[in-house]
């Protein structure tokens, strides 16, 4: 019984890491395909919120970007500050900037997403709360 429970818990953690990495990979692909940058990033954000809530890292009525950032930090404790900061910048730029997002913004977003995916793949498991 205990071994089966351990295997199930481990698979859930592995699937969570894969789920989050897949969200970032998919968003990078959308950007590469020329999709609307803001829309792709908002979809990424919404998907992450869904996963983080489902795993118990983010409360349903969260209100601030800081709470979201803390949830990502809790879910991915080994994610580098640089990767988290670049990801925050992408979300903030898409949400709050009024200018047209161009190639430089797209490249920055793709680099941030790719970096986070690479780190998640190195880190491995995400715990359940």
Model-derived features: positions:
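Hydrophobic, helix-length membrane anchors
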Residues: 1-39, 126-129
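Membrane-proximal, non-transmembrane interaction modules
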Residues: 30, 37-129
């Amino acid at each position: 019984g205990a071994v089966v429970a351990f295997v199930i818990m481990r698979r859930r953690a592995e699937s969570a890491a894969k789920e989050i990495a897949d969200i970032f990979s998919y968003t990078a692909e959308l950007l590469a395909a020329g999709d609307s940058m803001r829309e792709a990033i908002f979809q990424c954000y919404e998907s992450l919120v869904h996963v983080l809530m489902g795993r118990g890292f983010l409360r349903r009525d969260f209100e601030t970007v800081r709470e979201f950032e803390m949830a990502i930090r809790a879910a991915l404790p080994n994610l580098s500050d640089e990767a988290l900061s670049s990801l925050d910048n992408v979300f903030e730029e898409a949400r709050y900037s009024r200018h047209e997002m161009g190639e430089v913004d797209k490249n920055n977003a793709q680099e941030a997403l790719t970096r986070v995916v690479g780190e998640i793949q190195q880190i491995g498991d995400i715990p359940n709360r």
